[in-house]
C-alpha cells in the first residue's frame, strides 16, 4: 500500500509540473455534429450532437484532449433528455501547416446510449480532423470520431480557441 501511494504521489508531482508549465498551450472548443448510432437491428439513427473540448499541447505535435458530448433526435432535448452521452480522453498527434493543422485522435471513451438502445460501454475512440485558422488564436474545426467499433460516430463542425496561438 505504501509503495502504491508513493507511486501515485510521484506521478501526480510529475503531472503537476507539466500542467503548470504554460497556460498558452491550452485550448478549448465547442461544436455541433451529426451523430449516428448503430441500432441492434442493423440500421443507423441520425442524431444532432453538441460537444465541448478541452486540450493541452504537450509538445508541438503531441497533445491530450478531453471531449464530452450529448446527442438526441429532437433538438429540444439534446441537453435535457439525450439519447447518447459520451466522455472521451484522447491522445492528439498533430501537424501544423501555414494556416491549417491536421491531427489524429485516439483514446478511451465512455458511451451511454439510452431510450431502448440500452448500451452503456467503455471502449476505444479514434478520429481525425483539421483546423483552419482565421487568426492566431481561433480556428474553424472539422473532425470525425468513431466510438466503440462503430456503435456511435460523429462528424463535427465547430471552433477551437488556442490561448497561446497556433505558432
Task: Show the residue positions of the predicted features.
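Cleavable N-terminal export/targeting peptides
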Residues: 1-25, 166-167
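Short glycine/proline- and aromatic-enriched beta-strand/turn motifs that initiate or cap beta-hairpins
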Residues: 20-64, 68-74, 93-94, 101-104, ...
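Outer-membrane beta-barrel porins/channels
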Residues: 83-90, 151, 160-161
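Mid-chain, well-packed structural core segment of small domains
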Residues: 101-115, 119-123
Amino acid at each position: 500500500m505504501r509503495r502504491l501511494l508513493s507511486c501515485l504521489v510521484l506521478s501526480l508531482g510529475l503531472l503537476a509540473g507539466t500542467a503548470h508549465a504554460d497556460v498558452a498551450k491550452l485550448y478549448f472548443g465547442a461544436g455541433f455534429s451529426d451523430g449516428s448510432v448503430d441500432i441492434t437491428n442493423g440500421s443507423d439513427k441520425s442524431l444532432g450532437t453538441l460537444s465541448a473540448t478541452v486540450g493541452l499541447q504537450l509538445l508541438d505535435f503531441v497533445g491530450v484532449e478531453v471531449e464530452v458530448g450529448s446527442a438526441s433526435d429532437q433538438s429540444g432535448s439534446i441537453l435535457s433528455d439525450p439519447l447518447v452521452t459520451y466522455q472521451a480522453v484522447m491522445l492528439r498527434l498533430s501537424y501544423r501547416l501555414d494556416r491549417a493543422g491536421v491531427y489524429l485522435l485516439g483514446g478511451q471513451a465512455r458511451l451511454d446510449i439510452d431510450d431502448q438502445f440500452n448500451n452503456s460501454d467503455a471502449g476505444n475512440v479514434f478520429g481525425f480532423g483539421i483546423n483552419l485558422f482565421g487568426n492566431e488564436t481561433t480556428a474553424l474545426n472539422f473532425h470525425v470520431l468513431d466510438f466503440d467499433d462503430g456503435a456511435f460516430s460523429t462528424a463535427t463542425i465547430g471552433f477551437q480557441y488556442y490561448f497561446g496561438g497556433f505558432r
